[in-house]
Swiss-Prot record:
Entry-linked SMART domains: AAA
InterPro entries: AAA+_ATPase, DNA_recomb/repair_RecA, DNA_recomb/repair_RecA_CS, P-loop_NTPase, RecA-like_C, RecA-like_N, RecA_ATP-bd, RecA_C_sf
Name the record gives this protein: Protein RecA
Family: Belongs to the RecA family.
Major subcellular location class: cytoplasm
GO BP terms in the entry: DNA recombination; DNA repair; SOS response
Cellular compartment(s): Cytoplasm
Binding site for ATP: 43-50
Record function comment: Can catalyze the hydrolysis of ATP in the presence of single-stranded DNA, the ATP-dependent uptake of single-stranded DNA by duplex DNA, and the ATP-dependent hybridization of homologous single-stranded DNAs. It interacts with LexA causing its activation and leading to its autocatalytic cleavage.
Gene3D superfamilies according to UniProt: P-loop containing nucleotide triphosphate hydrolases
Length: 274
């Protein structure tokens, strides 16, 4: 079909789903992750990728949204998810055997129009059927990249039409022999880089200690690509073990940044009260 934008279709504000982090929502420029789009969240191990996605699922469920989690890594922890505010009993969970099965389930969920958010954890774990059925040591060059490219070609139209948010979690690999620039790359070929409207790079920058015990991570998120707002903004926040994003700490940090809260030494004051 072809249509003319003659004013009959009013430009509406973009539908978004909050990430559960005020700083990341601000860095995204639209107040959250855009619906009807593909989002990629990548970073090193234990940097908070799955935590950020579970926080977003919890926020989506709070507004009455229906969410699905495709656990290709077979590492979903319902106890931890519940601690982050996820209503596990209302979450659709799939643990597929192959990459083809995972992406077929994702496509079916999106086409149904009955799901608001789908998370795929992770692209690196989407193993092609041929690789699973083959022998250890067999070479399967480019199979995963081809699988992702084909799946995204099919998915994007359905995602836009049903206004579903699809988040792909991805891992980092090192390119061999890179002399200049970053040797880091994400798995699954280049297709996801092109199809994603938002790409978030999440990193652990330090530890949070209480005495000698480490109780959390200092985390930095960089918006590497953004088709819905200006890119390259950053957000810093704390992830506390067993609790998720430290909302209170983030509120104070943003208060200081925007001169709402005054900081002098180790003291914070708001309207004169410390």
């Amino acid at each position: 079909s072809i249509m003319k934008m003659d004013g009959s279709q009013q430009e509406e504000n973009l539908d978004v789903i909050s990430t559960g982090s005020l700083g990341v929502d601000l860095a995204l420029g639209v107040g959250g992750l855009p619906r009807g789009r593909v989002v990629e969240i990548f970073g090193p191990e234990s940097s908070g990728k799955t935590t950020l996605c579970l926080e977003a699922i919890a926020q989506c469920q709070k507004t009455g949204g229906i969410c699905a989690f495709i656990d290709a890594e077979h590492a979903f922890d319902p106890v931890y998810a519940r601690k982050l505010g996820v209503k596990v009993e209302e979450l659709y969970l799939s643990q597929p055997d192959t990459g083809e099965q995972a992406l077929e389930i994702c496509d079916t969920l999106v086409r149904s129009g009955g799901v608001d958010m789908v998370v795929v954890d992770s692209v690196a774990a989407l193993v092609p059927k041929a690789e699973i059925e083959g022998e250890m040591g067999d070479s399967h060059v480019g199979l995963q990249a081809r699988l992702m490219s084909q799946a995204l070609r099919k998915l994007t139209g359905h995602i836009k039409r049903t206004n579903t948010l699809v988040v792909f979690i991805n891992q980092i690999r090192m390119k061999i022999g890179v002399m200049f620039g970053s040797p880091e790359t994400t798995t699954g070929g280049n297709a996801l880089k092109f199809y994603a409207s938002v790409r978030l790079d999440i990193r652990r920058t330090g530890q949070i200690k209480k005495g000698d015990d480490v109780i959390g991570n200092e985390t930095k998120v960089k918006v590497i690509k953004n088709k819905v707002a200006p890119p390259f903004r950053q957000a810093e926040f704390d992830i506390l073990y067993g609790e998720g994003v430290s909302w209170e700490g983030e509120l104070i940090d943003l208060g200081v940044k925007y001169d709402i809260v005054e900081k002098s030494g180790a003291w914070y004051s708001y309207n004169g009260s410390k």
